């Protein structure tokens, strides 16, 4: 089984700026949160990347990654309204 890896500094930056971490993504993946895996939309600029679409607390996040022989390197985490609507039917009302 491959393991997940990421940049520790980037993880802290994501925690501060976006309120989410790679650990939360991994937790969601291990508990059935994977919605899809797609090719990176910009294949010319990122030919070796794919994108995980992950459900975290009823919101879809895009997680670009590079797959090596022994590990999967997570690049960043991008919240996506468009993918939330496509895969989860929109943002859930908290009332």
Residue ranges and their predicted role:
Residues 1-95:
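Ribonuclease/tRNase effector modules and their secretory precursors
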